[in-house]
Regions:
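A generic structural signal for short, non-catalytic loop/turn and secondary-structure boundary residues
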Residues: 1, 57-61, 100
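Residue-level detector of functional hotspots within protein domains
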Residues: 1, 7, 50-52, 64, ...
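N-terminal, Lys/Arg- and Ser/Thr-rich interaction peptides
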Residues: 1-22, 33
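Generic beta-strand structural signal
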Residues: 4, 62-64, 103-105
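Residue-level recognition of well-ordered beta-strand positions that form the cores
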Residues: 7-9, 65-67, 108-110
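Glycine/small-residue-rich interface belts in oligomeric ring/scaffold proteins
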Residues: 17-86
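Internal, well-folded beta-alpha domain core
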Residues: 69-163
Length: 163
């Protein structure tokens, strides 16, 4: 087994799993789908590409875990958007968007495919598309990646986010 460790820190993060329409919630820690989305962005996988399903399937097969380094604070943002057509306002949309403020997480991605983990590490250091921690308004602070071949899972308890 090989493990790639990712440190997620930012002023704001949002990890939605069931948000719809007017209320955009966030989970209290990163979701696997959110992390896979960020990795797919780094790798340059386009949703409508022919091989996108195969690439995403490979990413989904990886094992995933999160350690909370700093919980952060749940905050709510009142958000209003106005739609304008032909120089006239036609509608206003009001939503509540929830974020985690100043949270820090250590995310572990485990796979038997060491080449895939190396490819992900390289892509996260030089992403094809911008990286976000859940939403576009949540860019990470200098994402740190570390690749650990044959990393025993019990050692994860001793790894600090600062390493």
């Amino acid at each position: 087994m090989s493990v790639l460790l990712l440190r997620f820190a930012a002023p704001l993060q949002a990890w939605g799993s069931s948000s719809k329409f007017d209320i955009r919630t966030t989970e209290r820690e990163p979701t696997k789908s959110g992390v896979i989305g960020m990795i797919a962005s780094a790798l340059g996988i386009q949703r409508n590409a022919e091989n996108a399903d195969d690439e995403l399937k490979k990413l989904n097969e990886m094992r995933f875990g999160v350690r909370v380094e700093k919980e952060g604070k749940l905050i709510k943002d009142f958000h209003m958007v106005r739609k304008i057509e032909n120089r006239k306002m036609t509608a206003s949309y009001i939503t509540d968007r929830y974020y985690l403020s100043d949270a820090v997480f250590l995310v572990a991605i485990e796979s038997d495919d060491t080449e895939l983990l190396k490819k992900i590490e390289s892509a996260l250091q030089r992403p094809v598309y911008p990286l976000f921690l859940g939403r576009r308004s949540c860019p990470p602070t200098l994402p740190a990646c570390r690749y650990y071949p044959h990393f025993p899972a019990d050692r994860l308890r001793r790894v600090t986010a600062a390493q």
